[in-house]
Amino acid sequence: RIGDHALDIYEFSLKLEPYKDLKLDEIEGLSLFVVKMIENSIKAYVNKDYELAEKVIKDDDYVDEKYAEIIDKLSKNEYSIDGKCLPFAIYTTLVVKYLERIADHSVNISEWVVYISNGFYKDKKIF
């Protein structure tokens, strides 16, 4: 799934090429943050690192906040996007949504690390 979303992001980035002057720095920062979440969730799984898994789970709150913030700004046109640039807003929305979904997949990996560590999955004891 993460790979599918990454491919979708790549395809939308090609469609965003004509609008490169409208680049949003927030998306680059968000993407780097999400990549770090992926790395940390895999590292937590390999090393059975409960604390790192918990960090990834908490980091998702930041991604959710940034997602909502960017979508809100796009919907209110706070980026002063010309009406001719509607595709920019649409493709950017999709890119940000896929980044948020990738972060969610990192959380899923981390939730299973927590389960492996203590038998709890989403705060419920499972045997």
Where are the model-predicted features located?
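Cytosolic, long alpha-helical scaffolding segments
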Residues: R1-F127
